[in-house]
Amino acid sequence: MKFFLLILLLAPLKSESYYVAIYGNNNTNDGKSISYPFRTVAHAATVMSAGDTCFIRGGTYHEIVNITDNDGMDGMPLVFTRYNNERVIFDGTVSIDSNWVQHAGNIWKTTIDFDIWQLFVDREEQVMARWPNASFSDSSVFDTENHWAHGTMKQSTPNIYGNGTLIHQVKTNDQGELIDLSAQNFDLDETNKEAIGILNVGSFRTWSRKINSHTGNTFTYDPVPQNEWKTKEHQYFLEGRLEFLDKEGEWFLDTAPTKNVLYYWAPSGQDPNKLNIRGKVQSYAFVVSKSDHVELRNLEFFGTAFYFYKSNRSKVDQCNFYYPSSSKRMLRASGQEPDVSKIKSSSYTSVTNSAFRFTDGSAIETSGGNNVIKNNYFYHIDYTSSDLTGLMVSVLMSGKNNKFQNNTMHRLGASATVVGGDSALFEYNNIYDTGHVQSDGAMIQCMTGAQPGTVIRYNWLHNSKKYGARFDGNGAGNNGLMHHNVMWNLGNSGIMAKGYEHKIFNNTVINGPGNKNDILIMIGQGGNAGSITRNNVANRISGHRSGSYQNYPVPGTYDHNENGYESGRDVSTLFIDVANLDFRPNPDSVLVDAGTVITGITDSYSGSAPDIGAYEYGGDMWSAGIDWNVETKFGSAWIDYVNPAPQIDSIVVANNNTSLQAYFNESVFNSIENQSNLEASDFALSISGGTATLASATPTAITQNGNTYTLSFNLSGTPDG
């Protein structure tokens, strides 16, 4: 019997490189060379397939790139990236070029025939007209004590009013200003022009609602979800009316079916006609749907963001996001989640080595599972924290087995900073200056169902009025692990553990509030039966929020801890140099060799036994946060793209010196937003040397051959024969 072996030879898939440039053309160019690029990234996306790369030449692009049902493959993704390290910007704003006229006093106005929901002057966000006043420049938008208003509701007097009503508390702020709603004589409930309240009436949740009725210091609104409304401190501010525009840097948009009227108070009495004013008109520059293996690399985004939906194994890497998201409250959209950077129903995705700065809304939300957010910088995130998904946090990851690693985060509004989903890993993060505009909250927050398998390790959590890391909920959570974290200068406990069978190992918590315990292993709410607390150091470790260890011993197994309640020592003196972030124990410290071996946790210890706390004397001095410098990489402030002047390839002068032709072959364009053919009047030329001079700096003609342009000029001077 003979056997025949049939061998099929499959040709490897060929990858293509496509090029996009401001000076390109979607109709006549094939996009396959730098000389014949496409004009838009969106067009390139329509012809790309697995393994293809779109190289984008330097410039500012205002477009929406839709990618639907176009998968890459493992090792052959669809890649969108810059060309040759040139700076590529996706801009979600447009210039406000219409004429401004004075409206009243310092307030100017103009009409526009499009909607905007964020205003910028010289690329800096301006404040939506509000009461009480606040500013971005001094971060007073985060100061709820002095620049928000307050309700009379207190936890000690919980029945003053119900959900859907708020009674204002008259008070004086730190600048001596009386915050009295009734004294303002506002018309908050004018039909179709109602004020919008940003209402923190749910402790760690905030909603925006239109004001339904108003008398004196009392107003009503459509109730928020009843099970989320809390009888704790209430705080709020108001937007949505022209009468709130009473300070420089504020703006208001009076929306209308055909023409919108835009009002603005320019700083220092300036004429807005002379300012660089732009408005946000776009939520997303990239919308990727049902397309796996799509990658965005080395791109910058101003006033716009990305959205991935059902797009597994996609990546965002080395990108700079400046003002990526904003609420549409100025368009009278209340109770609506802002369009934030989002990866939805997608798994095995990653966001790495990128910066997210100045958001209204969460920095990023992911759902799906096995997603990674690593080595990113987050700053000035969400000054309202309203109308968000779930717990309304700065970064939300849902699904299972996510990783949040090596990130730096500071100046954050939401009470809870990061939620990681079920069985998440949080490690090597540097988080501080958080929780400014809501009550309650923790920097790393784990609710009941998320706790089994969750690991929180090697983090720096500090300088915040919130909890550091918390296993929270109704007490049913279990089997979470916290180890080798350092927490300092907190206004609440560094560690809180509700539930049971948790493991709390080798943590250092110092410089706590004094009236709260540093490590809290709750006796109530789960009771912590089976929990193990071992090798930790803090001044106050207890089973109660504020009561002593002697009165409230830590439940479960408790041993080999340095607890100031027991020793009477101030543990902050036991480390080498806390001020310079050296949390290793002093060589003669009682912490050295005072711990006990925990398999998988203390394996690399030196000496006769592990040290107590997060660091080993003589061991690895690990650090937390990003491993790059945001100012070096992306700058400390936004800088607009400046297109370099074209370099002239050659010059041909007529024999009689009467004319000159200049040739160039460079990326040249005359406008980003209002494109038209290049004209002679778009150019100016100067020459030096010799006796000839230009009759005019403006060319007499411009001709094109492919991407080579020829400019013609008349000369004056003495002919050389």
Q: What is the predicted role of each segment?
A:
Residues 64-66, 304-308, 325-333, 337-339, ...:
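Short glycine/acidic-rich loop motifs that flank beta-strands on beta-rich extracellular proteins
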Residues 641-721:
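Non-catalytic beta-sheet/beta-sandwich ligand-binding modules that flank or precede catalytic cores
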Residues 3-11:
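Sec-dependent N-terminal signal peptides
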Residues 19-310, 314-338, 596-609, 621-633:
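Extracellular polysaccharide-degrading/modifying enzymes targeting complex plant/algal/animal polysaccharides
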Residues 292-302, 312-325, 347-361, 370-384, ...:
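Right-handed parallel beta-helix
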Residues 63-79, 478-584:
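Predominantly extracellular beta-rich ligand-binding scaffolds that present long acidic/polar faces
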Residues 11-15, 620-649:
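Low-complexity, Pro/Thr/Ser/Gly/Ala-rich linker/spacer regions in secreted
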